[in-house]
C-alpha cells in the first residue's frame, strides 16, 4: 500500500470518528426524525382520551374519544406556562417602553437646554 492510499484510509477514518463524536453527545430529539410532532407534544404523561403506546413518551390519539388536549397542540400545563410567559412579556415590554419614553423626554429636555431654546 503506497503512501497516498494510506493517507486516504487514515483521513477517511478520522472523518468517521469526527462524525461519530459529533452525534454521540447530541440529544436524541435532535438526531431522530420529528415523527412525534413538535417538542411540546412529547410529554411523558398520558393525556385524556389517548392510548399509551409502548414507545416512551408518545401517546397516540384514541380512535374513539376526541383528544381535546392534543387537538390544540399543547397540554394544559404548557398552555398555562405560555399564558404566564405572554403576561410577563407584555409587562416587560410596557416597562421598557416607559423607560425609553422617560429617557427620550429627558434627552429632549437636555438637548433643548443646551441649544438655548
UniProtKB/Swiss-Prot annotation:
Gene symbol here is XVI
At the top level, the lineage of the source is: Viruses
The UniProt entry lists membrane topology as: Single-pass membrane protein
Q: What does this protein do?
A: Protein of the infection vertex complex, which increases the vertex stability. Anchors the vertex structure to the viral membrane. Essential for viral infectivity.
Is-annotated flag, keyword Membrane? yes
From the Swiss-Prot or TrEMBL record, state where the protein is found. Virion membrane
Which keywords annotate this record? Capsid inner membrane protein, Membrane, Transmembrane, Transmembrane helix, Virion
Can you list the GO cellular component terms from the UniProt entry? membrane; viral inner membrane; virion membrane
Q: Which residues cross the membrane?
A: 7-24
The name this protein carries in UniProt is Protein P16
| Source species of the chain | Enterobacteria phage PRD1
